[in-house]
């Protein structure tokens, strides 16, 4: 093999985030094409891609060289740090670079404005494992050379040479587009000769080919928030910064062959080694010098004794059951110790039990871990695995060595406290969370590139929305253009070729950094000994620079601390119950056979019930009539694509339909699911019973079936048949059973996970059944910012007889508050425009000074720090001041006056003396008067901040009237050929169907809401009247819809009318209710104007009421009016909608 002439060392991959678009896979392929024996990457201030690069190089037979392009602090110009490249020579260098990068992001003396290395760290630390390149024209030497300051350049070179003895190289770069760099090259060569330093040639690679330059510029603009045409934006890169072949470098540095030779020399000096596949658990302290094994055995046996007392209070029954449990416990402990995982179990039980004893609710289990009796004994999980036939081997298989993985659900609001406990126990440097990489999906990249190209938002938005989804993920641009012809048509029509060209090059490129939802790393020392650590800013949590897959590869153990909203709801509900009733409820101790709770499921009254909220699940529950916990476990497992097909058979068999087991030997394991294979554990047990597999071997079979590898399946089929033959089962029957298992293994669910989640489902249903107001108040408090969900829960509460009390500055808190007798006080925090700090300032003022007496008093006592004009407006519009002043319009008109008055009083109070004596003499502030809003105005304003109508409903004033011609309430609909419906339109959306345009109209009355489809000629006839915030009368056909949402009804409009049109057509008379404040003269003039000749006219009926009496007025026969939209609109404006009624 010929000696290489050049090894690339300086290269930014896509993991430089703000620039660089080299994808590692393509880089390795091109390096192989160039015949490179070694290759380096040097991302900017990070090692995000190092492990991926290392593994890819090793697989391709290329020597990996790890490095980082680092910023180094510049005391003379802090906003212009110098650059250098630090290359890993050996294990010590790997640790040192990791330490330096970590310090740049999380160190106590880091630069908080941008990540950089403090020169003192380099001066005072051991850099012997690193090689340093000077940074060419961006380095301290190069910057001084280009500025003509040779003395400073010399001083800098000597400094770096001292920091990196025999490992500092003067870096040389040449680009045809950058002739100004040549001064740095010549100066560096001269200085190197003078000081006896080596030189090395690098090429600053940013992308793979020359035609990637424009895409790279777009990438830089996306990261920096610029547009491509911005003349002021940085232009740091050139088209020549692509991955060039060694021959090009040989030509460029023909006059300096030693600079090329030194790239090879550096490659030889560097031996990066990353240990992969070995796990490093933190050290768990044990008492009394016990080994980890002995301490696990001790805690497990003690925990089992405690659990057995809970499970079997009767001593005789407990004694009878104990041998079975003890045998299972000993079996599990032997495997855990054999696989060297006692430390893992001890660590997990420690932070879970800390959480449970410190007010941090923990879920009963999640994933396959609920199948472990050791976990149950240690209180890691809260479900008896023997009772529900949960298998330990599904969690930890001695025949397939891999780390156990407990997924632990914590209450969302307390999860951070548990992580903080772990930090304190093991040391902050030993704990971090895990980075995730956000990429530019096809939908996102269209919007991003469109922005930097300054294309119309509507065009990019439309293109993005045209990209179809597959399994909830957008298709690639290539596939989307093949699938959706409109994309290509739009590109051609709008001349958007450049958008697509750039977007394709950037698609799926790493765009940003995030944090893994639950993963927490605990290392047996500093995290940075295994992975550098990154922190976005002061408020963020530290994360590893390696993502989930990479940290596991380097041996760090991930512990999943997941936040589950429903645990927060349960905790809040239990607190609510204690506050309203005094009852102390622990959902972990409620009986699992309470038929009051199961009635919630039988009635499909499962809004807010964990895992059972969807329309499809409710439809299934209505037919199922469930009575026991095992059925809930099955429903959690069945209601997913694939298994859903078995729901009808499952429900029918639940109700008594006869069925046969596929083989009598399987009756024991299939009886709980009525002969249907639902769980992965059943597949494993069937393999054990029929095929003679161990449960560990059965787990391997299950995995093989799930992966559908033909060669493995052939092998397993024979093993299974041999085992079946020993049971006297024919090959034909054996193959039938195997095929049946194979079918279910593909989508069978993990029973351990289903059982744990079914338990939370049951607990939430139990709370809803026994303490509905307390539970729903907690549920709504968990969704304060989600208006759609709040409306959904509000409707459910009303359907269950819960009354809502309005928001009130003198009664409400930040969250929803339950009251006795099925009442909930609306939360101030659910009003848009408020916030927790603002509401806390209200409640604090209320607690210290009593109830507020008016707007002036409120503004004087609540600090301006959290109570700005926008928040005050929101509270008024939402009705929170109604108890002290119902005129919301007047309050809004006086906000500035009230806030100014509060400021003046505060200023006077600070002055003291004279102002104290004058306080009583100051004339009281007079509020500006303003007419009250009409009911419709009040509701419209209220909806802007509540998100829906709370104090009333805009349909209310019309309900009595329209029921004369549309008597059917929306919650009483049933399939029928023709029905006339009436309601208030809350939303209209349109879409293109197979037969043309379709509109979906959301219609509400006082009983409920439906969605009505309007299409074809009906849509053409009424397109102008399909608008939100008005009453419509709709002739409809109602049919059963087994596939749609709602209550399984499909409503199709045949005719649509506005209320005004319906009045014109069908009105028989007009009733007006008059009061003293009405303008009678104006009314007479209005009515006279609508006595149109030669038109159909209707008679008037007048009534009058004041404080003392009421009565009907005799109206002369000549007073008839022409019914019209104009008349009704003018009357409602003059008298109010409640005073105008049409009789049909």
Swiss-Prot record:
It catalyses: DNA(n) + a 2'-deoxyribonucleoside 5'-triphosphate = DNA(n+1) + diphosphate. One of its GO terms (cellular component) is cytoplasm. Keywords: Cytoplasm, DNA replication, DNA-directed DNA polymerase, Nucleotidyltransferase, Transferase. Its main location: cytoplasm. It is found in: Cytoplasm. This is DNA polymerase III subunit alpha. InterPro entries: DNA_pol3_alpha_NTPase_dom (IPR011708), DNA_pol3_alpha_thumb_dom (IPR041931), DNA_pol3_finger (IPR040982), DNA_pol_IIIA_C (IPR048472), DnaE2/DnaE/PolC (IPR004805), DNAPol_HHH (IPR029460), NA-bd_OB-fold (IPR012340), NA-bd_OB_tRNA (IPR004365). The keyword Amino-acid biosynthesis does not apply. GO terms for biological process: DNA replication. It holds the Pfam family DNA_pol3_finger. PANTHER family: DNA POLYMERASE III SUBUNIT ALPHA (PTHR32294:SF0). Belongs to the DNA polymerase type-C family. DnaE subfamily. It is an enzyme of class 2 (transferase). DNA polymerase III is a complex, multichain enzyme responsible for most of the replicative synthesis in bacteria. This DNA polymerase also exhibits 3' to 5' exonuclease activity. The alpha chain is the DNA polymerase. Present in outer membrane vesicle formulations which are used as vaccines in human.
């Amino acid at each position: 093999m010929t000696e290489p002439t050049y090894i690339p060392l300086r290269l930014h991959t896509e993991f430089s985030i703000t620039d660089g678009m080299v994808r590692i896979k393509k880089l390795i392929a091109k390096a192989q094409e160039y015949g490179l024996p070694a290759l380096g990457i040097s991302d900017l201030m990070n090692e995000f891609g190092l492990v991926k690069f290392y593994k890819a190089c090793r697989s391709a037979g290329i020597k990996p060289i790890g490095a980082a392009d680092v910023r180094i602090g510049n005391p003379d110009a802090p906003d212009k740090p110098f650059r250098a490249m630090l290359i890993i020579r050996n294990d010590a260098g790997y640790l040192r670079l990791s330490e330096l990068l970590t310090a740049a992001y999380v160190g106590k003396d880091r630069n908080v404005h941008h990540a950089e290395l403090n020169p003192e760290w380099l001066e005072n630390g051991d850099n012997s494992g690193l090689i340093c390149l000077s940074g060419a024209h961006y380095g301290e030497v190069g910057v001084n050379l280009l500025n003509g300051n040779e003395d400073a350049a010399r001083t800098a070179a000597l400094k770096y040479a001292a920091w990196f003895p025999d490992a500092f190289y003067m870096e040389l770069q040449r680009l045809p587009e950058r002739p100004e760099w040549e001064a740095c090259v010549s100066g560096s060569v001269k200085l190197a000769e003078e000081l006896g330093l080596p030189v090395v040639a690098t090429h600053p690679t940013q992308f793979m080919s020359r035609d990637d330059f424009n895409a790279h510029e777009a990438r830089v603009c996306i990261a920096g928030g610029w547009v491509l045409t911005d003349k002021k934006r940085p232009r740091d890169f050139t088209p020549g910064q692509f991955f060039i072949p060694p021959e090009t470098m040989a030509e460029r540095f023909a006059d300096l062959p030693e600079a090329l030779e030194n790239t090879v020399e550096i490659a030889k000096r560097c031996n990066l080694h990353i240990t992969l596949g070995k796990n490093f658990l933190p050290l768990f302290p044990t008492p009394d010098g016990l080994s980890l094994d002995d301490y696990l055995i001790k805690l497990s046996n003690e925990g089992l004794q405690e659990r057995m007392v809970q499970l079997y209070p009767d001593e005789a029954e407990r004694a009878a059951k104990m041998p079975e449990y003890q045998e299972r416990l000993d079996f599990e402990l032997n495997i855990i110790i054999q696989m060297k995982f006692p430390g893992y179990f001890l660590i997990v039980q420690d932070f879970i039990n800390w959480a449970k004893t410190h007010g941090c609710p923990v879920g009963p289990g999640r994933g396959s871990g609920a199948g472990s009796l050791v976990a149950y004994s240690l209180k890691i999980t809260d479900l008896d695995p023997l009772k529900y036939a949960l298998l330990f081997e599904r969690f930890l298989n001695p025949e397939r060595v891999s780390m156990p993985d407990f997924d632990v659900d914590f209450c969302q609001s307390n999860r951070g406290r548990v992580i903080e406990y772990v930090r304190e126990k093991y040391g902050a440097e030993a704990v971090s969370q895990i980075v995730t990489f956000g990429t530019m999906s096809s939908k996102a990249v269209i919007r991003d590139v469109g922005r930097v190209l300054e294309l119309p938002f509507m065009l990019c938005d439309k293109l993005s929305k045209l990209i179809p989804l597959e399994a909830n993920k957008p298709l690639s641009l290539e596939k989307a253009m093949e699938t959706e012809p409109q994309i290509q048509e739009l590109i051609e029509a709008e001349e958007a070729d450049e958008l697509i060209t750039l977007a394709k090059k950037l698609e799926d490129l790493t765009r940003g950094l995030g944090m893994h939802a639950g993963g927490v790393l605990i290392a047996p020392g500093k995290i940075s000994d295994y992975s550098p650590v990154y922190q976005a800013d002061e408020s963020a949590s530290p994360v590893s620079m390696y993502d989930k897959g990479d940290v596991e590869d380097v041996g760090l153990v991930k512990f999943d601390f997941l936040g589950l909203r429903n645990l927060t709801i349960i905790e809040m509900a239990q607190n609510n119950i204690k506050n309203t009733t005094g009852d102390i409820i622990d959902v972990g101790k409620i009986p699992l056979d309470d038929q009051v709770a199961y009635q919630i499921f039988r009635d499909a009254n499962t809004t807010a019930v964990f895992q059972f909220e969807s329309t499809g699940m409710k439809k299934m529950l209505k037919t199922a009539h469930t009575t026991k916990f095992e059925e809930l476990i099955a429903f959690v497992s069945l209601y997913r694509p694939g298994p859903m097909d078995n729901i009808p058979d499952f429900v029918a068999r639940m109700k008594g339909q006869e069925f046969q087991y596929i083989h009598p030997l399987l009756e024991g394991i299939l009886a709980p699911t009525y002969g249907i294979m639902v769980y992965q554990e059943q597949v494993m047990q069937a393999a054990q019973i029929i095929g003679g597999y161990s449960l560990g071997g059965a787990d391997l079979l299950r995995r093989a079936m799930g992966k559908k590898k033909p060669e493995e399946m052939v092998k397993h089929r024979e093993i299974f048949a041999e085992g079946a033959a020993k049971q006297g089962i024919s090959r034909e029957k054996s193959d039938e059973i195997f095929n049946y298992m194979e079918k279910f293994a593909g989508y069978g669910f993990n029973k351990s996970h289903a059982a744990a989640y079914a338990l939370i489902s049951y607990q939430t249903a139990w709370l809803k059944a026994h303490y509905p107001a307390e539970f729903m108040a907690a549920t709504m408090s968990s969704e304060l910012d989600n208006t759609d969900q709040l409306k959904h829960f509000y409707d459910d509460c009303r359907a269950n007889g819960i009354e809502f009390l309005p928001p009130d500055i003198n009664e409400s808190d930040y969250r929803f508050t339950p009251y006795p007798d099925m009442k909930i006080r609306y939360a101030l925090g659910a009003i848009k425009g408020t916030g927790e700090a603002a509401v806390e300032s209200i409640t604090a003022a209320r607690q210290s000074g009593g109830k507020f007496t008016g707007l002036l008093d409120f503004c004087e006592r609540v600090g301006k720090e959290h109570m700005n004009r926008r928040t005050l407006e929101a509270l008024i519009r939402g009705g929170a001041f109604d108890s002290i002043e119902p005129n919301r319009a007047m309050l809004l008109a006086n906000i500035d006056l009230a806030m100014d008055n509060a400021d003046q009083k505060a200023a006077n109070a600070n002055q003291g003396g004279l102002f104290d004596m004058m306080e009583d003499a100051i004339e009281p502030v007079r509020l500006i008067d303003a007419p009250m809003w009409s009911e419709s105005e009040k509701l419209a304003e209220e909806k802007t901040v509540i998100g829906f109508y709370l104090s009333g409903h805009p349909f209310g004033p019309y309900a009595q009237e329209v029921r004369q011609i549309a008597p059917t309430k929306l919650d009483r609909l049933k399939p029928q050929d023709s029905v006339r419906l009436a309601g208030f339109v809350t939303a209209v959306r349109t879409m293109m169907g197979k037969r043309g345009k379709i509109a979906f109209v959301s219609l509400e009355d006082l009983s409920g809401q439906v969605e009505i489809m309007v299409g074809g000629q009906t849509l053409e006839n009424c397109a102008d009247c399909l608008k939100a915030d008005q009453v419509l009368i709709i002739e409809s056909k109602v049919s059963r819809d087994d596939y749609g949402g709602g209550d399984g009804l499909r409503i199709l409009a045949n005719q649509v009318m506005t209320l005004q049109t319906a009045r014109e057509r069908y009105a028989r008379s007009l009733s007006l209710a008059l009061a003293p404040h009405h303008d009678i003269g104006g009314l007479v003039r209005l009515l006279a104007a609508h006595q149109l000749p030669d038109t159909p006219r209707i008679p008037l009926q007048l009534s009058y009421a004041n404080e003392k009496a009421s009565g009907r007025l005799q109206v002369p026969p000549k007073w008839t009016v022409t019914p019209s939209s104009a008349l009704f609109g003018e009357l409602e404006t003059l008298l109010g909608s409640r005073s105008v009624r049409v009789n049909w």
